């Protein structure tokens, strides 16, 4: 009983005691002893041994150790987070930020605040920049350039550092055109100017010379102007003048230019004799010809350009339509220097017919009076006739309607060899019927004497038969633009 009681008591007591003991031992002994055993764990000691000084929050090393490493600790594995102790989580959800993140070439960490070296414009993190200024000399440490996937080499700069600027992330633009440049600028415009000045300069000289050869072809050949508008000397005139004048224009429309046309309306575009005698001969060939061209545009009488004898001249030999003002064999003739309007003194005319109305526009082959003596231009022997027009017998007293030389050629200076008026003859617009040789009707339009080279046969163009139209009244006496001959009134009654 006692034993049982003891057992029961023991069991009860043991059960109760054991329960109390367990309750006491578990929280006191087990819980209290285990923390004491865990405290001397080596982890805090390892951390303390790794960083002897007070650790930075979030990093396991201080600024000096980080600077002294000079990126060598992270040189082979830069930009990888294996050796970095990040104290924040990266959430890659969201939009991509355009602001680039640069890594410091000294410590290899991302740069939040730049330390910008002036004047070389290289950047490091601001802490490394200040540490470099304190410990190192006043030279830029240079930048790191990637040799291969995991290796980098340092590009030396060695520029003296005057000051260090502090810049926030996103405020600088770094040059990445050339590897190792890494210069930073405060604006995109300055960065582009740096790229154009430093890196694109070599390509510019090759592109510049290309547009240069474009300009020379734009200028017209200088020989074109003298061929068309300036009367060259006889020798040169025979060579290059004919092809243009015989091809470009239709047969020159004959203007009914009997004596009224030559006297008054021709005076409107004819300079005074004083101008003829005073101006030197060589410039006159150019200046007066140019004046002739300009007066044609304003005159109501002459509208035919220089290339008048195109088709008609084609039937003639390709001689110069207008010989020059001065022929070598007649150097001293004074009145010949009027290349465009004045009829040469050697021209012989029949007695003037009743004046037909002046034509203000070119006419196709105006009526040519039959039997009239031809206007002799004394410019040269007539070229051989290849297609002679049918002989016609117009009534006498009419000048053959031939294009006056001032319309297409300057009159020749030398007097005709067949005996024309002397050199000091009256001006060409004065007609002396007595001095004009009268030709027979059987001579036709093919036999006027021509003694000067470059002459033009007046009868080369087939002229319609019939007398020229009669004028209703005397030609208008209203002044017309252009210089007037001072003696114009002297000869006016002759034609009225």
Swiss-Prot record:
The keyword ATP-binding does not apply. Residues 350-360, 380-397, 407-430, 464-483 have a biased composition (Pro residues). PANTHER family: E3 UBIQUITIN-PROTEIN LIGASE HAKAI, E3 UBIQUITIN-PROTEIN LIGASE HAKAI-RELATED. Keywords: Developmental protein, Metal-binding, Nucleus, Transferase, Ubl conjugation pathway, Zinc, Zinc-finger. A zinc finger (RING-type) spans 104-144. It catalyses: S-ubiquitinyl-[E2 ubiquitin-conjugating enzyme]-L-cysteine + [acceptor protein]-L-lysine = [E2 ubiquitin-conjugating enzyme]-L-cysteine + N(6)-ubiquitinyl-[acceptor protein]-L-lysine. Residues 35-60, 304-496 are annotated as: Disordered. The HYB domain forms a phosphotyrosine-binding pocket upon dimerization, and mediates as well the recognition of its flanking acidic amino acids. This is E3 ubiquitin-protein ligase Hakai. InterPro entries: HAKAI-like_RING-HC, HAKAI/CBLL2, Znf_Hakai, Znf_RING/FYVE/PHD, Znf_RING_CS. It comes from Xenopus laevis (African clawed frog). Belongs to the Hakai family. It is found in: Nucleus speckle; Nucleus, Nucleoplasm. Residues 157-215 are annotated as: HYB domain. GO terms for biological process: mRNA processing; negative regulation of cell adhesion; positive regulation of cell migration; positive regulation of endocytosis; protein ubiquitination; regulation of cell adhesion. A zinc finger (C2H2-type) spans 173-199. GO terms for molecular function: ubiquitin protein ligase activity; ubiquitin-protein transferase activity; zinc ion binding. Pathway: Protein modification; protein ubiquitination. Homodimer. Interacts with tyrosine-phosphorylated SRC substrates. Component of the WMM complex, a N6-methyltransferase complex composed of a catalytic subcomplex, named MAC, and of an associated subcomplex, named MACOM. Component of the MACOM subcomplex. It comes from the Eukaryota. GO terms for cellular component: cytoplasm; nuclear speck; nucleus; RNA N6-methyladenosine methyltransferase complex. Its EC number is 2.3.2.27. E3 ubiquitin-protein ligase that mediates ubiquitination of several tyrosine-phosphorylated Src substrates. Associated component of the WMM complex, a complex that mediates N6-methyladenosine (m6A) methylation of RNAs, a modification that plays a role in the efficiency of mRNA splicing and RNA processing. Residues 304-314, 434-449 have a biased composition (Polar residues).
